[in-house]
């Protein structure tokens, strides 16, 4: 099988597009447990100087190969959820594509836009702190799975367990504030507790960056 050359239509993400064509033809790409190539990011690298263009190209490429990507990530819901959040932020996803994501990870139906109302931050870590700095007095308290954090203060706000949060919560929105690769597991945790609506910190921070 002939894969062909780099596709100049995908300038900025041509490596990714080439790998996906390889996977389309041969199924998988195996790894070699050696460092054969190092990729450096610096202030004048393409990834930094043309970030917006790279994101646009990346999403064009993802849309072209979306069925392959969904198939490969079907058993990796954390990665698939992160991909969904990134794509949803940068482009208007077609309704039929949203349904494809929902069929694999139905919990994403619970993601809603932050409503500029009182909130609870689920995740008393770096991203939680960043989110609190943006929302300030709108944040009532934090929630975390780490028992060692319960009862302590973060930004002068208490850190509670999930059980305590459920007892004290009124109509506050819950904001999941963890790395994008862990959002899905937090969503599942809330879903099982009967909380079916939540916001994602990444979307809030992206909004306030504008």
Per-range role (PLM):
Residues 1-4:
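Conserved nucleotide-sugar donor-binding
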Residues 6, 10, 46-48, 159:
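Short clusters of hydrophobic/aromatic residues that line enzyme substrate/ligand-binding pockets
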Residues 11, 25, 31:
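A contiguous binding-surface segment within folded domains or other stable secondary-structure elements
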Residues 11-18:
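Acidic donor-binding loop at a coil-to-helix junction in glycosyltransferase catalytic cores
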Residues 16, 34-35, 123-125:
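Short, well-ordered beta-to-alpha junction loops that form the rim of enzyme active sites
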Residues 18-21, 28:
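Short active-site alpha-helical segment characteristic of glycosyltransferases
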Residues 27, 34-43, 48-73, 93-110:
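Catalytic core of nucleotide-sugar-dependent glycosyltransferases
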Residues 73, 77-210:
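Hydrophobic, well-ordered beta-alpha structural blocks that scaffold small-molecule cofactor pockets
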């Amino acid at each position: 099988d002939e894969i062909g050359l780099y596709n100049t239509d995908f300038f900025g993400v041509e490596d990714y597009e080439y790998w996906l064509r390889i996977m389309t033809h041969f199924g998988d790409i195996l790894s070699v447990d050696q460092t054969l190539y190092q990729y450096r990011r610096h202030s004048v690298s393409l990834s930094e100087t043309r970030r917006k263009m790279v994101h646009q190209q990346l999403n064009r490429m993802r849309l072209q190969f979306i069925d392959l990507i969904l198939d490969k990530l079907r058993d990796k819901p954390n990665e698939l959820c992160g991909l969904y959040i990134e794509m949803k932020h940068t482009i208007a996803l077609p309704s039929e594509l949203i349904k494809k994501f929902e069929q694999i990870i139905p919990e994403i139906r619970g993601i809603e836009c932050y409503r500029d109302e009182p909130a609870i931050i689920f995740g008393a870590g770096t991203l939680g702190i960043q989110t609190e700095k943006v929302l300030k007095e709108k944040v009532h308290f934090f929630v975390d799975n780490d028992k060692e954090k319960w009862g302590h203060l973060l930004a002068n706000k208490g850190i509670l367990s999930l059980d305590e949060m459920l007892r004290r919560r009124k109509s506050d929105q819950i904001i999941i504030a963890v790395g994008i690769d862990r959002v899905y597991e937090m969503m599942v945790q809330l879903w099982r507790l009967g909380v079916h609506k939540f916001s994602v910190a990444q979307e809030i921070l992206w909004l306030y960056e504008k």
